[in-house]
Design a protein with these regions (language model features):
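Solvent-exposed interhelical
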Residues: 59-60, 118-145, 177-197
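Interfacial loop-to-helix transition and helix-capping segments at the boundaries
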Residues: 30-43, 98-113, 153-171, 206-237, ...
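Alpha-helical transmembrane segments and terminal signal-anchor/GPI-anchor hydrophobic tails
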Residues: 166, 185-265, 272-280, 284-298
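Membrane-proximal cytoplasmic C-terminal regulatory module of class A 7TM GPCRs
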Residues: 279-285, 290-291, 316-329
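Loop-centered beta-sheet repeat module
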Residues: 136-183
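Hydrophobic transmembrane alpha-helices
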Residues: 48, 52-56, 117, 121-125, ...
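Aromatic-anchored segments of alpha-helical transmembrane domains
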Residues: 2-9, 72-79, 141-155, 198-212, ...
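Transmembrane alpha-helical segments and their boundary/interface "anchor" motifs
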Residues: 27-47, 54-108, 112-113, 117, ...
Length: 329
């Protein structure tokens, strides 16, 4: 989640996402392209981990996620409305807030994709379970060819963008298929080599994006960070397998895993279009700093912001449980 927040800080806070439309990208040096190359894997990692450990669908949890999201959006819009309050309550403003709350999926593609994935996960899990080892490897290769080659390279309609439910299902299945003994044993033997390739591919991908951007190929430069890019997918798989193998012998990962239940607020508060401009406003005053200082500050700010959001979400959960207990009485 820290990686996702740091990615939001660069893309939305510093305006790095605008490189696809700008003709002059000199304001962003090679460092930003390299940094975003490694941060772009975070969303894929989230879906992959969900598939590896396999989601256990509970309707109550799906409803809870929807209610939490709508509650946060309502609260954020009320706060923004009060901050801009002119002394007159406009009917259209109220309707606009209601629309944003009810149609929250228009601003949160990632959460929407996860909710849909949450609903269909039992069927995906059963499909993977009945496949043989060879069939699983065949399916893994087929999915890669369809989404990462046909989608990213050939730009086939509805597959060319990684910002979709298709990408979520793709990475979920990849995560499930990586549970096979063959892949686990392969990673144990070649883990160090794969980790080196992870770093090399990340650096080369960022460098290529920077070169394309400096030559005026802005859309191509931004496309290098697409979630269905073969490089981004490969890096996400290697990163996740490394974490999974480390977590088997590390209690720290278990403790960090318990904190993930409070991570919803970090995503909701840093990716909402109306609020992220305020959240990342302090980062706009880093012009006089060196690139190294900027990167360090971005990560520190992302860590701080993540834990602040987790604190807010933990308070919300306490209030939710308190109200629920009172109602049960």
């Amino acid at each position: 989640m820290v990686m996702i927040v740091a990615g939001h800080a660069i893309v939305h806070g510093l305006g790095f996402g605008n490189i696809q439309a700008n003709t002059n990208n000199n304001q962003f040096g090679l460092t930003y392209f390299e940094m975003n190359s490694f941060l772009a894997i975070a969303v894929n990692c989230f879906f992959w981990i969900s598939g590896y450990f396999q989601i256990k669908r509970r309707i109550s949890r799906a409803i809870e996620l929807i209610v939490e999201t709508m509650g946060y959006i309502l609260l954020l819009n009320i706060i923004l409305y009060i901050m801009n309050y002119s002394g007159v309550v406009y009917y259209l403003d109220i309707l606009r807030i209601i629309k944003r709350v009810l149609f929250f999926y228009q601003g949160y593609w990632f959460l929407t994709a996860y909710l849909i994935l949450f609903i269909i996960s039992p069927y995906l899990n059963k499909m993977v379970e009945v496949l043989s080892q060879d069939e699983k490897k065949e399916l893994l290769i087929t999915l890669f060819l369809i989404n990462s080659f046909c989608g990213f390279v050939l730009k086939i309609a509805s597959l060319d963008s990684g910002f979709s439910v298709v990408q979520g299902v793709y990475m979920y299945l990849v995560g499930s298929l990586c549970r096979t003994d063959d892949i686990q044993n392969f990673f144990k033997k070649k883990g160090k080599i794969l980790n080196v390739l992870f770093v090399i591919f990340g650096l080369l991908n960022g460098c290529a994006a920077y070169i394309f951007g400096s030559k005026g190929y802005n859309e191509v430069a931004w496309r290098m960070f697409s979630y269905n890019s073969p490089v981004i997918v490969f890096m996400a798989i290697v990163a996740c397998l490394s974490v999974v193998h480390c977590s088997r012998s590390s209690k720290i990962c278990d403790k960090l895993g318990k904190l993930s239940r409070y991570s919803l607020a970090a995503y909701l508060l840093t990716d909402y279009p109306l609020i992220r401009e305020v959240v990342f406003l302090p980062l706009k005053y880093m012009n006089s700093m060196s690139d190294f200082e900027k990167i360090l500050l971005i990560f520190l700010y992302a860590i701080m912001l993540t834990f602040v959001c987790m604190g807010i979400d933990s308070i919300r959960k306490c209030l939710y449980n308190y109200i629920e207990n009172k109602l049960n009485i």
